[in-house]
């Protein structure tokens, strides 16, 4: 089942260390990250760029900008460690500096998505790229 979930995430193109990011989003929001955020708005998912459609989509925009600041590793592929302690994400102490940055980016987007659950709109669950307005710069 885990392999099937990973394949689904890869096919939809969710950025970040797929397993960790997906777990964080689920832990913080209680939502399936692939179904609910894989194609959401103009910034959630790979290859999507554009003016955010709402606060939820803005979380993904900020996440993309956070990844642009990471140097020394591939935030889309390299894995890191983290734990879920007392309903809070804790990035692993033994992560190298680059992966600590990636973990913090992923933690921030997961928390942002939780904090903006009230702005989540099912009509934006599948937004086609051509409908997005010119992207904003970080």
Swiss-Prot record:
- Give the UniProt family note: Belongs to the phospholipase A2 family. Group II subfamily. R49 sub-subfamily.
One Gene Ontology term, aspect cellular component: extracellular region
- Where does the record place it? Secreted
Its job: Snake venom phospholipase A2 homolog that lacks enzymatic activity. Exhibits potent myotoxicity causing myonecrosis and edema in the gastrocnemius muscle of mice. Is also able to stimulate the release of IL12 (IL12A-IL12B), TNF-alpha (TNF), IL6 and IL1-beta (IL1B) from human monocytes, and induce IL2, TNFalpha and IL6 release from T-cells. A model of myotoxic mechanism has been proposed: an apo Lys49-PLA2 is activated by the entrance of a hydrophobic molecule (e.g. fatty acid) at the hydrophobic channel of the protein leading to a reorientation of a monomer.
In Swiss-Prot or TrEMBL terms, this protein is called: Basic phospholipase A2 homolog promutoxin
Top-rank lineage group of the source organism: Eukaryota
UniProt record, GO biological process: arachidonate secretion; lipid catabolic process; phospholipid metabolic process
CDD domains on file: PLA2c
Q: What residues does the record give for site: Important residue of the cationic membrane-docking site (MDoS)?
A: 122, 125
For this protein, the record's PANTHER family field holds: BASIC PHOSPHOLIPASE A2 PA-11-LIKE, PHOSPHOLIPASE A2 FAMILY MEMBER
Species this protein is from: Protobothrops mucrosquamatus
The primary site where this protein sits is: secreted
Annotated InterPro entries:
PLipase_A2, PLipase_A2_Asp_AS, PLipase_A2_dom, PLipase_A2_dom_sf, PLipase_A2_His_AS
């Amino acid at each position: 089942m885990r392999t099937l979930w990973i394949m689904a995430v890869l096919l939809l193109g969710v950025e970040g260390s797929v397993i960790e990011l997906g777990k964080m989003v689920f832990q913080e929001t209680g939502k399936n990250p692939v179904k609910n955020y894989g194609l959401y708005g103009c910034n959630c998912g790979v290859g999507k760029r554009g003016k955010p459609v709402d606060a939820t989509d803005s979380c993904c925009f900020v996440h993309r900008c956070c990844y642009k600041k990471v140097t020394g590793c591939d935030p889309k592929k390299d894995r890191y460690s983290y734990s879920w302690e007392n309903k809070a994400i804790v990035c692993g102490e033994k992560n190298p500096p680059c992966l600590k940055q990636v973990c913090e980016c992923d933690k921030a987007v997961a928390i942002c998505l939780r904090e903006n659950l009230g702005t989540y709109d099912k009509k934006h669950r599948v937004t086609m790229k051509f409908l997005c307005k010119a992207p904003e710069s970080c």
